Amino acid sequence: MHYVLKICTKDAKGLIYRIADVIFKYHINIIKNDEFVGEEMFFFRALLEGEFEPKAFMGTLEAMLGERAFIELHEKRKKDIVIFATKESHCLGDLLIRHYSNELEANIKAVISNHNELKDLVDKFNIPYHLISAENTSREEQEGRVLECLENYQFDYLVLAKYMRILSPNFVRHFEGRIINIHHSFLPAFIGANPYKQAFERGVKIIGATAHFVNNNLDEGPIITQDVININHEFSWKQMQEAGRNIEKNVLSHALDLVFEDRIFIHKNKTIIF
């Protein structure tokens, strides 16, 4: 069996030795490990291999490190996700294809959308599609129906693949640290509809994308990964849009790989990634 062990605790001398000693006593093999110290905090991630009782192992670590330490042990497996989308197909389509090709370290349990444009696409992959419209209803009522729908699924993460709805603090609170979003990096310079057209009119020279965890502040959650590409005056706004969509797909895909491999620590409003 393979497991991922993650530890975050106040830095102290001898932590690596003490953790390794517990691992050794349980006859566990360390396949790979990483550590980092910053802001007087110690971060440790290890890929483990062995047959052992996880509950007893965790109890020993907790007794040694103290109750204030953050300790997680996950069996290495594919994660389960639900995808939220609206009308744009590029990010959703990329994830569906990767899932179909067994290149995504996750099982897509369902797709939820506030519009019906993407239903035919999702149906081709035999994945449940739920239309939960936001028309003529309050945000609270629409999110309540979304929560009811989610009760039918066991999942690890929610992925916002260009879901053009602002989630309420109450909704986010249900899934703290478990919602991943992708957006173009023009914010806050180009807010609202047609950001690529706005960027074209402004004459920007780079375009990019950011993947981040969602918190109560719009597009200000802990950043997972970012990327940019250079453009010039020869790009029409349609070409900028196409290039932007490609980079959004790539950034979201890379971010999800990091999340699904349990490589990320969220500390304050930042991420530590191994």
What are these regions (language model features)?
Residues 123, 127-153:
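Adenosine-nucleotide cofactor-binding segment
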Residues 106-117:
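Short internal beta-strands
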Residues 99-107:
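A short alpha->loop->secondary-structure connector
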Residues 8, 82-84, 112:
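Short hydrophobic segments within beta-strands
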Residues 29, 107, 128-130, 178:
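Conserved beta-strand segments of alpha/beta enzyme cores
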Residues 78-94, 98:
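Short, low-order "capping/linker" segments at domain edges
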Residues 1-79:
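A conserved regulatory-domain signal marking ACT and ACT-like small-molecule sensing domains
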Residues 115, 138-144, 153-274:
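Donor/substrate-binding cores of folate-linked one-carbon enzymes
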